[in-house]
Amino acid sequence: MKSCILKSINSIYQIGLRGVGSGRQQEFDEAKAYGSNLISAYEVHDIGVKEVLKKIPDGANYYITFDADGMDPTIMPAVNAPTPGGLNWLQVRELIHGIVNKGRVIGFDLVEISPSFEKGNTTIIHAERLICNLIGAMVRANYFN
């Protein structure tokens, strides 16, 4: 089944990676060998979201899997691997809006939130706002007309 699904995927972009902490070097090497485009959080910080968005092909269907570990822990602290240097709120918002405007988002999921690590509601508030931003961007892009 996995190979059938993978055959229908033209390219994969992983944006906001921060080292090998959540994966072994072999997994990164295999992802690159498969053709995945790996863009670290530091590259996003250095070149900016607009330049990252230029690397993603226009006019495609996009499925976004958002890993909460990729955001800075000041924004998403209730994750399994809170590590400084993640993407900030404005960067993630700009990425979401940029992808919505490049083509068609056909699906979205938000993973790696660990409610047992939450102190207050910081993570869940930001997660909810991300989903609302995605839906709002889709409405403004006339997805539902």
Which residues are covered by each model-predicted region?
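Conserved alpha-helical scaffold segments that buttress catalytic/binding sites
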Residues: 1-145
